[in-house]
Amino acid sequence: MIGPVIKILEAPEEMPAVEALQRAVWPDSETDVVPAHVFIAAIHNGGLLLGAFVDDQLIGFVFGFPGLETTPDGPRAKHCSHMMGILPGYRNSGVGFALKRAQWQMVRHQGLDHITWTYDPLLSRNAYLNITKLGAVCNTYRRSEYGEMRDGLNAGLPSDRFLVDWWINTRRVERRLGKRARRPLKLHNFSQANLQPLYAPQAPAGSWPRPPEHFSPLEGRLALAEIPSDINALKEADFALARDWRFFSREIFETAFASGYLITDFVYDEGRSFYVLSHGESTLEQ
């Protein structure tokens, strides 16, 4: 597919299409649809709404607004990227990357250097985009961030989320978004370095992998943490097992972040998904 055309959306007559797109992306969630007047209010106060178009059809959008974060030196301005939605038929085709790259350009023009957003840690596709492709990092785990969610993609599981940091002026991010983007890491890159995963999911023949009862102590500079490769398919096949993965992964990441680790990469290879945990901040510029 030829890359989508990315446009800034700011006129009232453009908002109904964004409302309709939300209903297509998040079915059964009418009460969660962001209405036109909220988009307009945000846009008039520094917010940013970008749309992706193919043949003049809106197929995706990303929406964010200015925010403040608490630092030891006082409040600091950032951009809060709140929503991104893409029609199912256009996922895994580079639309999300194109939207985030355009957002990166626009927010830099606003004079900001930090974008944050949340996503479900168990969504491999989102992790691959956010961490591998965009170069965001994470050391914040939020339990039940949005309370009970009712839409078709999120219903049933606790709404635990990663809060990721995208330091948009760093060499790390500029390299990921450049024309010569770094090749994604593969499992053999870690096996060559004699780095083994923290745990091996139990995988009975013909069934979904199950989280182990225990995991190895976090030691050294790097660690690998495996998650299910397709949590949505797992939810449909065995919802109780999907919940087990939610609580197991919660323990893994809360333990890692409390011990000074942060997520700096993500590996999808051979049908398996792994987060790369780094101790300290030595990899932020890479």
Where do the model's predicted regions map?
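Conserved GNAT acetyl-CoA-binding A-motif
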Residues: 107-120
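Conserved acetyl-CoA-binding loop-helix of GNAT-fold acetyltransferases
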Residues: 86, 92-107, 126, 241, ...
